[in-house]
Amino acid sequence: MAGNSIGQIFRVTTFGESHGVALGCIVDGVPPGIPLTEADLQHDLDRRRPGTSRYTTQRREPDQVRILSGVFEGVTTGTSIGLIIENTDQRSQDYGAIKDVFRPGHADYTYEQKYGVRDYRGGGRSSARETAMRVAAGAIAKKYLQQKFGVQVRGYLAQIGDVVCELKDWEQVEQNPFFCPDPDKLEALDELMRALKKEGDSIGAKVSVVAENVPVGLGEPVFDRLDADLAHALMSINAVKGVEIGDGFSVVTKRGSENRDEITPEGFQSNHAGGILGGISSGQAVIAHLALKPTSSIMVPGRTINRQGEAVEMVTRGRHDPCVGIRAVPIAEAMMAIVLMDHLLRQRAQNGDVVSNVPRW
């Protein structure tokens, strides 16, 4: 009802606010016997963690995760896994000026209208700080997918503003603060970030996420199609305003003869569908792209209103990302992994004994 959970068998429920005492989540449906330590989760959390480069918010949270339950002697027990991350670097005084003012482009106005009350400190529950717990839960899913099925989920920054980053080298993604796979674009990205910082403005971005070695058969017709659930999960990430599966909106200008993924005895000849046909995984790489809006927390004055409906001009102070798309890469990976793990467990539960003589590649 409250919209704080995702998944049916592998189910993740998060709680906490940006400037609250802590963030937490409960992860249900994790199979028993999976080796799991806090270090397994910390790797991805460190990739998402704020304050790690000059291109992201300078709020410095260690994001040290603690496992509270569901793991005994280094392996999962099959019971609920409780996770918690304490907030340590809140500066709530930065937000006192907006207590009675609605920041344009943020959730302040809609939360106030929906609940009649809001935590104005850092956006409260609407803050992207909440996604730390998604990344922690996603790390569990990523480990299970990799160990049990050889599925690898990876993401990268595909575009910031007018700077397009081609997928040239996966290894480059972890070698720079932008998660950029194209080393030739790093200088342009750096120049863009410096210009935005000087102007006090922000910029949008495109993030791509790819899952390889996904088994064929994942997805439930008709409302729980794999692509529908992926779109739901990825659209739930803060600032995401669009999701594409495979070639996405570019199919508008294509003919059917060029867009269809033809099949030969050697396998599929293309992957315009992004690894999903009829809402069910085809065994090809599952590919999704996300469009993220530029953050509205900027130093450029903007018009808004206060609680009394009076016109106000404001500047959003605090520590903010000039491009939220940079830190969205591990978040997108986590959400794709969560959906894939849930569908793998659902497929195993219903169709685990199904045998098909049709070739698989």
From Swiss-Prot:
GO terms for molecular function: chorismate synthase activity; FMN binding. The keyword NADP applies. InterPro entries: Chorismate_synth, Chorismate_synth_AroC_sf, Chorismate_synthase_CS. Signal peptide: none annotated. One of its GO terms (cellular component) is cytosol. Residues 37-59 are annotated as: Disordered. Its cofactor is FMNH2. NADP(+) binds at residues 48, 54. This reaction introduces a second double bond into the aromatic ring system. This is Chorismate synthase. The gene is aroC.
